[in-house]
């Protein structure tokens, strides 16, 4: 099988892979959301990028659909038809959207993909309700198909949800811990949080597709672990974009994570470096950081090597994901498509 380093040379295939999977999943996703209460369905459609407030067709592009693509490719890589992965794809997309709805509320993020977050557009209570509905709908989606693998798939999704909540809880608690000292957040704690918060659902997406296609347990486990490594790399990418990302691309203010005092990996790595004391003093100031202060903080993180070290860790996580996929017995063509998708995500990170 082609290693990830080789796949990195040809990332243009990824957009076509994502488009194919989105088009396959879209009818089932639309049908599932359409069964909700009309008001809740509108909020869900808005969150998914299908419509604007009031239900008019969306004028902005929707998300890439990485998780649903992983479920479809997981089914194909296990030797099954793409359609076998569709229930898993719908379920993980609904759970992902539910998590974003609640995450934006907890973090106070007013923007999502360049427009008001659901809680800003519709209100906090309605956004919580829409998230709850999507969570319930995800479980229902997996139980609807009369397949011998549905029960195992629901158990797998439930375990991923448990980890997702654990990761989100850790992320919220990190905010109250000091920047330095014995109570500060350690890099190992960050890795555990990222695997749960982001990696659990990516691993679940790959594993669900394979599971619904009837793959053996070893293959399902290998794909789940690969997705978890991918999730850590994905979270690191978000951390980097949260400090240095272009607002036109991210839809969020530049240096937003620094302004909010988030314990992201580039910052944690910079704090452990020799020049970390100045950064800790700046971030630990009781006064809110103004534009000048957050720009200086970003500079200090980069000078201390936090940005470069985070990039290295992202590459290491991607290599681990690639190694796990190489160890599994996967159908050649879908496996190559998975690698092309990993390549795209690697470029997003690097």
Where are the predicted features?
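All-alpha helical catalytic cores of prenyl diphosphate-utilizing isoprenoid enzymes
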Residues: 30, 34-40, 58-64, 129, ...
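Divalent-cation-assisted or electrostatically stabilized phosphate/pyrophosphate-binding catalytic cores
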Residues: 59, 112-135, 180-197, 224-225, ...
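Alpha-helical phosphate/pyrophosphate-handling elements in metalloenzyme active cores
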Residues: 42-91, 137, 141-143, 187-230, ...
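Conserved N-terminal diphosphate/IPP-binding helix and adjacent helical/loop segment
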Residues: 1-95, 101, 105-120, 171-184, ...
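Short acidic/histidine-centered micro-motifs embedded in hydrophobic/aromatic stretches
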Residues: 46-47, 91, 108, 156-160, ...
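A glycine-biased, small/acidic residue-tolerant capping/turn segment at secondary-structure junctions
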Residues: 40-44, 110, 241-250, 277-284, ...
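Alpha-helical transmembrane segments of multi-pass membrane proteins
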Residues: 99-100, 231-235, 269
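Hydrophobic packing residues in well-ordered alpha-helices of helical domains and bundles
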Residues: 14, 18, 22, 40, ...
